[in-house]
Amino acid sequence: MTHARQDIREQVATTLRTEFANVYTSRAKVLFEQDMPAVLVYTTTETIQKERWDTDGFGNLFRDLEIAIEAVDIGKDDLDDKLDAMAETIEGLLDGWEMPNMKNAILRFKSTETDMSIDGNKIYGAIKLTFTITYQTETHNEH
C-alpha cells in the first residue's frame, strides 16, 4: 500500500502528462537538454490540523500537504515567457482539479517562484508553482 502523498504526486503527474511529455514525480531527476522542457512534481511540507482531531485522538487526520510543480527549460531572452506559458498551462490543468480516488481533497494554488542559471551560452530556468492540498486519512481506533 502506498502513502497518500505518493498517490497525490502520481495523480497530479498523470494530469500534467496530458500536456507535457517529460513529467517526473521526483525532485531528484537529473535533467539533460533532451529532457527539456520538463516538469517535476514533488511534495515538501505536510502538517496535521490538530484542532480537527476527534476528542479521543482517533478521528480522521486532516492533512495540509504542499505540492511543488517545477517547470524547467532552456532558453535565451525568451525564457521568462516560456516559463510563464508553462505555468499558465499547469494552472489551467489544475484549476478545479479533483483526485479520482480522493474526492474530498481540496487543491489550492499558493505561490510561484522563478529562478535562472547561466552556464556558458545556455540559460536554464525554472518556475515553481506551489499548491496546498487538504486531504483526510483514517487512524485506527483502538476502542
What are these regions (language model features)?
Residues 37-41:
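A short glycine-rich, His/Asp/Glu-containing loop-to-beta-strand
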